[in-house]
Amino acid sequence: MAAKIRRNDEVIVLTGKDKGKKGKITKVLATGKVIVEGINLVKKHQKPVPAMGVQGGIVEQEAAIDVSNVAIFNAETGKADRVGFRFEDDKKVRFFKSNSVTIK
């Protein structure tokens, strides 16, 4: 099955503490989760590893969000949108369901 949300897509968070925030997807996980740039930040307690030159301390990093909690952002309408698939020139492409514009 083709992925409706892919890496480098601009998405908007639908639920949770970061509801309404926009960001770019940096990674799509096989478990049905995505990591969005600057969203769902958590603090991780990092142990120092002198052999690798890693300094210890409290580090902020992005945690995964379930795919169902984000929606692709349509810049033309300024809202979250749903994604459909169609064939153009024998290629399967994604498009926004609200205005039928092809997603690049």
UniProtKB/Swiss-Prot annotation:
Q: Which residues form the signal peptide?
A: none
What is one term from the GO cellular component aspect held by the record? ribosome
Any GO MF annotation of the entry: rRNA binding
Give the superkingdom in one word. Bacteria
Tell me, which GO biological process terms does this entry list?
A: translation
User: What Pfam families would the database entry show?
Assistant: KOW, ribosomal_L24
Q: What keyword terms does UniProt attach to this protein? A: Ribonucleoprotein, Ribosomal protein, RNA-binding, rRNA-binding
- What subunit structure does UniProt give? Part of the 50S ribosomal subunit.
Family per similarity comment: Belongs to the universal ribosomal protein uL24 family.
What biological function has been recorded for the protein in this entry? Answer: One of two assembly initiator proteins, it binds directly to the 5'-end of the 23S rRNA, where it nucleates assembly of the 50S subunit. One of the proteins that surrounds the polypeptide exit tunnel on the outside of the subunit.
Official protein name in the record = Large ribosomal subunit protein uL24
Name the source organism.
Answer: Photobacterium profundum (strain SS9)
Per the UniProt record, the lineage of the source organism begins with: Bacteria, Pseudomonadati, Pseudomonadota, Gammaproteobacteria, Vibrionales
